């Protein structure tokens, strides 16, 4: 169980009523991971949402045409959410998360959080709106990476002499 005062300082939960923070803290816990530890990967079922407390996390995705994973984000700011597939309807993680340094995170049980948010729609709206903002930022990064890849490909293709 995490102290509600800690949750109150995190982006997803700041400003929520005390009773909401108390309820969420009941199904939250602190975890630590050593540097180079894989926290989750795409083949794992998603049961938790994570919030960074200390350290750095690298988020990667795998593309079948590449030998190395593609980094889609590095999280360093306390409170940043990751691994939120369990609260957006997916049953699995769609990326990998690796600890770049020793890290401390808060793990929130996804099913318990969703059950609580369903019972408290005003709190649910606030949390999901904040989560949508996080997802929007991540999609912006992915869009930029995709455009850079397309531009690089087109530059290479246009420089090929067919004669």
Predicted segment positions?
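Cytosolic regulatory regions built on CNB/CRP/Popeye-like sensor folds
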Residues: 1-163
């Amino acid at each position: 169980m995490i102290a509600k005062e800690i949750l109150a300082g995190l982006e997803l939960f700041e400003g929520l009523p005390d009773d909401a923070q108390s309820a969420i803290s009941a199904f939250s816990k602190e975890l630590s991971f050593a540097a180079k530890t894989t926290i989750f990967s795409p083949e794992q079922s998603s049961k938790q949402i994570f919030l960074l407390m200390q350290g750095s996390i690298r988020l990667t995705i795998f593309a079948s045409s590449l030998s190395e994973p593609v980094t889609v984000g590095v999280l360093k700011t306390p409170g940043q959410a990751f691994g939120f597939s369990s609260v957006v309807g997916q049953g699995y993680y769609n990326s990998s998360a690796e600890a770049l340094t020793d890290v401390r995170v808060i793990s929130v049980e996804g099913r318990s959080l969703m059950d609580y948010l369903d019972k408290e729609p005003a709190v649910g709206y606030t949390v999901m709106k904040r989560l949508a903002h996080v997802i929007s930022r991540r999609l912006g990064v992915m869009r930029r990476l995709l455009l850079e890849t397309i531009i690089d490909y087109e530059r290479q293709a246009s420089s090929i002499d067919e004669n």
